[in-house]
């Protein structure tokens, strides 16, 4: 498979790529080959009518679709597509070639119409406001498609009836010639031929318009719903997101919705739907999977009602042909309908269950990918893969059951016309009627005309079932509770903030008890010890609350908010930002607000755009903000200054840079109220002092600033201080007042006083990893885009992918078995109708009527049975292939190096594991099966006609060449359009997913419209390509239908001219078959396009499963490590050199040191010294360039990555929590007892060591019994956002304690906790990790001066390494200078050592 690179469109909303946007994958040569006629296959060159034309240049910009303003003839024949098809045949299509959507189809225009209708329908009390609003919006195009299909369906039925008269004409001529009577005039026969041909032509045009209008409506509905889901996600309340009890209004709406679905709520006040809440994963699934199902169903929706109409008309005509005998066949159809109804209900139920499993898989996949760095640190790849595999196993089994039922319905629906015709003909024969070829084969053609609607009806009903379920889910989401703006605005009040007895609550999942039941059922022996668990389970289920808050803050005041971990500092700011629900009292703000949260949300765009955040660029103000936030030095380092793309989630910049960017965003927003949640925790003291001076007390002077902080040394500069305790305001006052009168404040200050000087003077110039991350970028690149451009194949899906797909299905034997079953089923089917012709002409006089009937019935039954076996075998093999390829792709992705995740948007990966896998599961098998059945039927018909009408072969040759030319002409463009659409769709997913994760920040700043506009532009860009993917199908279909019409005409002429020589029975059989050709050719083209387009999804999954770069093996069988390794934890670095990528400078240079088992090493150093690189090297996130690292004598490069990482533990700076419970986060794979988990929570100070109750804030000196309780089953929401950053860091410490590894790496694990908790954590690390090897990368020198040795890094090398006291004695040493700047004296070091 040759690959080229799609230009990055996620940033520009789909702007054309630059000339230098191709990746180094040989795409230039590939595309040159595609465009070069000499590089094409000989038959492609021979059939190329444009081979002498010049290759057109790539346009500079995209233009509006040629459909806009096209003539009636051009629209009817899709001639407006011809210019693009021509370009696509001459060279691969580029993004600039893809036309934009018609102005009246832009999503903004459609959304406005939709929203007006939705409001109107909702106000009118419609039961299905969403459904009716969609109908109102797209009524004209929707009904036009339905009208076209009604005409088409009627013509499909009337054309076979007209063959009765042509067959009668042939019979008359045949009998007349045999009896010597005058033959009928040939003009009469030719008149029938012309009539049938005209009817076929009109039917073709109508069918293509129906399909085009249906797909167009589906694409437009998809666009509107994506925007609606996004808009709702921006407004969704925390309670609805978490799955909690909704407001009475929302409950009433949900009750109405459930009643319409014949489902009642379990009890009043119960959570919505399946009690899961609308987490990010479910919202993404709505946008990617459910919306796509609605889009798919729109394409052929009208078949659901036109099929019954055509069936009824056909039965009336059958009564005319066969009299009452047709009622026998009709009765069989009637009997079959209840079976179909029951089966559809079963499909509806199964699809709902499958949706839940798919949601689980997609949500877990997204969560794993978001925390992949942490998963790698702990070596959990295999365990998470097993968890995904288990969910996938149940999902595939459910899908296979669903498809088996669909196959049964399909085969029954295919068999019904056969058995109905069989029953009618047998009844007709047994009722003493002569089997005249004219009514018999006209009736056979009528029964055959029923085959397509009956075949498609169950598929369409299945799609409608899926869409109905999806529509209900979206409807349920749209009526979910919205975040109310509880905070009032009063521009005239003197204060900036006025809180009067206000109470707030976080809203989390109400169904935690249900989850707890499931977990306990899975682990019946895992129970909490009675002596440890809290007695009040209701309290443990309570979310954290702020109570009785009364506070007024002036417009120009700087107010600090302090308190212990979990006291409610961050919650107070979140409440003012609108993230918490007001439950009592009132809050009023006088002005606009900006929010700098503790956890920075970074967009996948440039640094400047992240700071501007939708505001207009003001160069002077921007420069002032950059300077005040100490970002100028960083801009000089970045390869393209502030235009540098900083990657998804800000992966290319350090924690300190993220925090400063966060502060800069809040300041640049120029609001009068600025909420700052611990903004100085991730920056060093030097930078923190600069920000305090220049930003908080500089640019923001004169504005209302509320600063939550652990840096208590800044309190003296604040106008007032708010002391939080247990979710309440404990005290408010000036620094002097609180120092004099408040005991809790005094206690906090006394704890902090030991560290305050260090915090003021500590002088690492910026956070340690900043320069190291910059070193990962090519310094000489002038404007490199960080995100890798998505691979895009420029050739058809190659045999490599097909072979991989067949192999993944089980074995290559499957392909042979499927082909054999298909051929056998078609042979039996053709023989069934051929036998009917022998019966009508009494070809075998020796056979009785009963024998004819018996053989005829046996062939019909055999045809249905073999078709069912074929269909079931194929769908089972296909879903097995999907399961295996997903497993390979997911395994490969989790085994990919971190550089892959750093340069690939999460939405792009999620797209492959949601949309593409959904296509492989549900659409690919159907498309391949229907294509295979239809193409073999066409071949069978051609062979049959040639056997009896030899001259047909002469006409077939030029028509076949025309068919082949048109197909080749089409496929070149179709491939490129689909691939462009796939990549543009990935960009929409990425943009949608990114914005959903940043909802809190987007809301706080009030920039929802900006992100909506960005998504809108991406959707329009995607639709520009998507609409063309089916427009070119229709262009081809019209032209191939012209071939089919000519085939009908030629066959009709041959029947007329051979009327004296060929039996009327054979003529009737041939005519009945040839009329099905037009439908079949249309269907073949459509299914071939579906197969190719759906195989594109397989190709993308296959690429992830085979082409991604891999890390070293997880296990090396030839070099296993014993269970007890490492027994001592001795680490040796021997001349270690490391660079992040080839061609980049070394970040570790000839580093050598020996760390004894049980030794505690503190690692410090200036910017870019290489401290974090040591961690990367030890975990082998980046492989060494030279040298080696040994642990207890074992070279870590010679053992498996899992064997290494599973024996290490890390406490990272950015802790990651997964959705579930505290138990599942501490011990996700049930490897430890509950007692061990409780002990870890106690040691990490997440629960009180002295009482039975478990409190979040054990460091709270007053230990209030009303504090939020934790149990092992306490729910952890998505990304753990219901816990403060400090609490998450404590959870990471508890996780490391549970792991009980011999070697622990600590990466500034206490940066977001207060000093009292920090002190207790240091004690825990000293006691809990006693005898363990501990490497600690530290910001606060005070925390490591009691370690055994200090390693001072400088420019990738060890500058100093010795005991703290010995390093202090070196007067010109780096460590000595750092200590002096931090206010650490010799006595401090000696004192700490003596304490030890």
UniProtKB/Swiss-Prot annotation:
**Bias type Basic and acidic residues, positions:** 510-533
Q: Where is the composition biased (Acidic residues)?
A: 757-771
| PROSITE patterns per record | ABC_TM1F, ABC_TRANSPORTER_1, ABC_TRANSPORTER_2
Keywords of this entry: ATP-binding, Cell membrane, Glycoprotein, Membrane, Nucleotide-binding, Transmembrane, Transmembrane helix, Transport
Tell me what topology the record assigns in the membrane: Multi-pass membrane protein
ABC transmembrane type-1 domain span: 143-466, 816-1093
Q: Record's InterPro entries?
A: AAA+_ATPase, ABC1_TM_dom, ABC1_TM_sf, ABC_transporter-like_ATP-bd, ABC_transporter-like_CS, ABC_transporter_C-like, P-loop_NTPase
According to its UniProt record, which protein family does this protein belong to? Belongs to the ABC transporter superfamily. ABCC family. Conjugate transporter (TC 3.A.1.208) subfamily.
Keyword flag Transmembrane helix? yes
Applied biotechnology = Cichorine and its derivatives are promising in the course of developing novel herbicides.
CC annotations in GO: membrane; plasma membrane
Q: What does this protein do?
A: ABC-type transporter; part of the gene cluster that mediates the biosynthesis of cichorine, a phytotoxin active against knapweed, corn, and soybeans. CicA is probably involved in the secretion of cichorine.
Segments spanning the bilayer are 142-162, 191-211, 300-320, 324-344, 409-429, 440-460, 816-836, 852-872, 930-947, 951-970, 1036-1056, 1065-1085
Q: Name one Pfam family in it.
A: ABC_membrane
User: Per UniProt, what is one GO molecular function of this protein?
Assistant: ABC-type transporter activity
The entry's protein name is ABC-type transporter cicA
Q: Which residues are glycosylated?
A: 321, 604, 880, 1096, 1150, 1154
Region of interest: Disordered: 1-40, 510-543, 751-787
**UniProt feature, compositional bias: Low complexity:** 18-29
Q: Where is the ABC transporter domain?
A: 525-751, 1131-1380
Tell me the Gene Ontology biological-process terms attached to this UniProt entry: cichorine biosynthetic process; transmembrane transport
Q: Which SMART domains match?
A: AAA
The organism is Emericella nidulans (strain FGSC A4 / ATCC 38163 / CBS 112.46 / NRRL 194 / M139)
